[in-house]
Regions:
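Outer membrane beta-barrel
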Residues: 1-20, 28-145, 161-162, 166-177, ...
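Detector for outer-membrane/organellar transmembrane beta-barrel domains
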Residues: 172-268
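Long hydrophobic alpha-helices with heptad-repeat/coiled-coil character
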Residues: 119-170, 236-268
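Flexible, solvent-exposed coil segments and beta strand-coil junctions
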Residues: 24-28, 99-106, 146-150, 181-188, ...
Length: 268
């Protein structure tokens, strides 16, 4: 399966990123140059299988798009996982993410504060009661820190001694759903001298969807934490999980964001 999507963008004052609205890429001072761009990078290909086993149905899912690095059209793996009953193994949305509250914006990037991360992981989901589930996962970590300690001038290599751990609770009815999650991680690196610097990072997230009349709905998401910038779509590649203070010590950086959106259907 999949679909073809083509974006045509005319920018009156050219952004640093010609394909998406990424505030972190806006040049300073602004460029007084217009630009037109057309791309089909957001098109997707999917493949799903369901196989009967003696335990239950084994589901596998693969999804790719063409949003490669540096505005290229290289293949990008979004999902590649196997799921049997309550256990998921492979790459998918981080458990810290709520895929039901993504606003349908004209720009593929979406709100710059929403949680956007595909992680290799092992996830277990337990049904508590009707409409209530709890999920726990151990996920691939990655420490976004400066590559140079500005005080000692030593090169630093990022390291992550532990998986990122996520716990999520979800409550859902026919009229609304509410989702909250906690993220716990270790962020750090090793200096060229061999000294290791690691700090604790955490995040909390709340999101939800409320159905109005017909198919209209309101969605929201709010996030706060320290050492979690890689989970936000806009600053995820800026190495802002942690930074060095004036004493050369590594400190987790606070990060927070949120949005709300309403979706209205003009016809059936």
């Amino acid at each position: 399966g999949g679909y073809i999507r083509t974006d045509a963008i005319y920018d009156f004052n050219q952004l640093g990123n010609i394909n998406q609205f990424r505030p972190e890429s806006i040049p300073t001072p602004n460029l007084d140059v217009s630009n037109y761009n057309m791309a089909a990078r957001a098109s997707r290909l999917t493949l799903e299988s369901r196989t009967d086993t003696k335990w239950d149905v084994l589901r596998t899912y693969i999804e790719i798009d063409f949003v490669g690095p540096g505005n290229t059209t290289e293949l990008r793996l979004r999902h590649f996982y196997a799921q049997l009953r309550n256990i998921l193994v492979g790459q998918s949305w981080t458990t810290f993410h709520d895929s039901d509250v993504i606003p349908e914006t004209a720009d593929f990037n979406g709100p710059n504060s929403w949680i956007f991360q595909f992680n290799p992981q092992v996830r277990y989901t337990h049904r508590l009661a009707k409409g209530q589930t709890v999920s726990i996962s151990a996920e691939q970590p990655s420490s976004g820190i400066p590559r140079i300690n500005p005080v000692t001038a030593q090169p630093v290599s990022s390291t992550s001694p532990l998986p990122d751990f996520v716990v999520r609770y979800r409550y859902e009815t026919d009229d609304y759903h509410f989702n909250t999650a906690g993220l716990f991680r270790s962020v750090g690196g090793v200096r060229s001298s061999g000294q290791s610097d690691h700090v604790f990072g955490y995040g909390v997230m709340a999101s939800g969807l409320l159905r109005l009349w017909g198919r209209d709905n309101i969605v929201f998401q709010a996030v706060y934490g320290e050492g979690i910038s890689r989970y936000f779509i806009d600053p995820k590649n800026l190495n802002l999980d942690a930074g060095y203070d004036s004493s050369g010590l590594l400190k987790a950086q606070p990060a927070y964001g949120g949005y709300a959106a309403i979706q209205h259907f003009w016809n059936e």
